[in-house]
Design a protein with these regions (language model features):
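Conserved C-terminal active-site "lid" loop/helix of NAD(P)H-dependent oxidoreductases
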Residues: 82, 105-106, 142-164, 175, ...
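Short, polar/charged, Gly/Pro-enriched helix-capping and turn/loop motifs at alpha-helix termini
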Residues: 25-29, 68, 99, 133-136, ...
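Conserved Rossmann-fold NAD(P)-dependent oxidoreductase catalytic core, especially the SDR/UDP-sugar
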Residues: 1-9
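Tryptophan-centric aromatic hotspots in well-structured domains and transmembrane helices
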Residues: 18, 49-50, 79, 107, ...
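Mid/C-terminal beta-alpha module of Rossmann-like enzyme folds, strongest
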Residues: 88, 95-144, 154, 170, ...
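Glycine-rich loop motifs involved in handling phospho/adenylate chemistry
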Residues: 74-77, 142-146, 193-194
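NAD(P)-dependent short-chain dehydrogenase/reductase
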Residues: 12-97, 115-116, 122-129
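Amphipathic terminal alpha-helices
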Residues: 169-198
């Protein structure tokens, strides 16, 4: 249990506690407030240049001609393309608008549990799609503990919101790497094309 895996899991509890204390659904007609929380998996997509994030680190390594360093190769994460949770958030917002009391709850948006990859698989696929690059796996010594498996239960979002991820993890990686292979002047139109295609 790492801080990264514990703190996000507390958000649904907090999202339930505050409304129950201050905006209880039984008194919705009085206060007219409905609060929901939404949690996403590990989001990937073009335009993320943050440090210590898997895809930007892969791209920087490839573009600099350096080996990509894979620190936790067997760690499994719920990777998903950025438009997946955004679609879920918009759907949740619409449902909250239509039936605020019913949908004021905690929701998860991520891939199906049978569609997860470990870090090494993501790196290998990204390098393959990019068409060049290499990776190395240094010995794991003195690194902070990180959970080996993180996943989200999206069952409620699937059954009650009728939300489904549209892309498999492999497709999310492909959409993402295709974006990074472009030059800056192409980003805008390509992004619009990805949104329309999605």
């Amino acid at each position: 249990n790492s801080p990264a895996s514990i703190s996000p899991s507390n958000i649904p509890c907090l999202a339930r506690a505050c409304p129950n204390s201050f905006f209880n659904s039984s008194k919705y007609k009085i206060h007219q407030k409905a609060i929901a929380s939404a949690r996403a998996g590990n989001v990937i997509g073009g335009g993320d240049w943050s440090k210590n994030r898997i895809i930007p680190d892969i791209i920087r390594g490839i573009e600099r001609g350096e080996d990509v360093i894979v620190r936790n190769p067997v760690s499994v994460r719920p990777w998903q393309f950025v438009l997946e949770p955004l679609g879920g958030y918009l759907l949740l917002g619409a449902r909250l608008n239509d039936e605020p009391v019913k949908f004021a709850d905690a929701w998860n948006f991520g891939p199906h549990t049978d569609d997860v990859m470990n870090v090494r698989q993501v790196v290998e696929q990204a390098i393959s799609i990019y068409g060049k690059g290499k990776y190395v796996m240094p010995p794991i010594i003195g690194q902070p503990h990180e959970a080996g498996l993180l996943n989200l239960d999206i069952g409620k979002s699937v059954s009650e919101l009728a939300w489904q991820p549209k892309l498999r993890t492999a497709g999310a990686i492909e959409y993402t790497i295709d974006w990074y292979k472009l030059s800056a002047p192409e980003y805008y139109n390509f992004t619009l094309g990805q949104i329309q295609k999605y």
